[in-house]
């Protein structure tokens, strides 16, 4: 099924059909958004120390908070995503990501302690990143395709390309504008999740076969393998 979006132009009314190809493109952009929220803040660690006077110890805590919030969201999302629906959840994920990026550029200069502003922004980004991590792969897996394995491989490659893009484009921004204007950078990056949020609100989504059956959270917490994987990620 395709969704039809009505577009009003100066030359008259036109219709654009959104198909599963647009859903796949939105998913690829979703993983680029994931790369932005995970990798932009570490690029600013030196700026946080020199411009905001935040100590290295407090900066390193941001990494732990980001990881912890994302893991918590991953655990809780299995239950409440079924309640609000996939579309609302993925739209909310991009809204959190955009809000976190904007907050990263604004809140440090609006709070008594700049660290509090940065911490709030990191938490918002982590919520968006956690939901995105849970949903994007199932969304792509549910799409009708003759090459699901290829689509999934390409999907995860987009995170790597997004990481490279964040580093290269952010470095180019600093070279042209200087680190003194760092606060504008995350606001500019927020355009990506905002645009993709609108796209996900309109593209067709498919229901994954058998997605009504889920392992209860309590059963997951009792699994020794789950705790082993968590320990490995923390150590990494």
Residue ranges and their predicted role:
Residues 61-79:
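Central cavity-lining transmembrane alpha-helices of secondary-active solute carriers
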Residues 12, 16-18, 207-230:
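Juxtamembrane intracellular "pre-TM" segments in multi-pass secondary transporters
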Residues 67-68, 160-161, 233:
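Short hydrophobic/small-residue motifs within alpha-helical transmembrane segments
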Residues 121-157:
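Cytoplasmic helix-loop-helix junction between adjacent transmembrane helices
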Residues 22-48, 52-54, 137:
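Extracytoplasmic
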């Amino acid at each position: 099924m395709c969704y039809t979006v009505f577009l009003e132009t100066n030359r008259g009314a036109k219709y654009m059909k959104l198909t599963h190809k647009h859903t796949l493109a939105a998913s690829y952009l979703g993983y680029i958004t994931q790369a932005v929220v995970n990798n932009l803040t570490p690029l600013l660690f030196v700026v946080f120390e020199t411009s905001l006077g935040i100590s290295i110890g407090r900066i390193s805590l941001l990494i732990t908070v980001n990881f912890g919030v994302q893991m918590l969201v991953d655990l809780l999302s299995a239950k409440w995503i079924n309640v609000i629906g996939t579309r609302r959840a993925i739209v909310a994920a991009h809204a959190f990501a955009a809000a976190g990026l904007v907050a990263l550029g604004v809140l440090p200069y609006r709070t008594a302690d700049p660290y509090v502003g940065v911490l709030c922004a990191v938490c918002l980004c982590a919520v968006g990143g956690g939901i995105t991590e849970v949903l994007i792969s199932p969304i792509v897996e549910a799409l009708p395709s003759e090459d699901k394995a290829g689509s999934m491989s390409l999907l995860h490659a987009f995170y790597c390309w997004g990481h490279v893009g964040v580093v290269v484009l952010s470095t180019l921004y600093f070279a042209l504008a200087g680190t003194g204007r760092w606060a504008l950078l995350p606001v500019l990056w927020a355009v990506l999740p905002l645009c993709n949020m609108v796209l996900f609100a309109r593209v067709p989504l498919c229901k994954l076969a058998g997605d009504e059956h889920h392992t209860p959270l309590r059963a997951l917490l009792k699994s020794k393998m789950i705790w082993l994987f968590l320990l490995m990620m923390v150590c990494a």
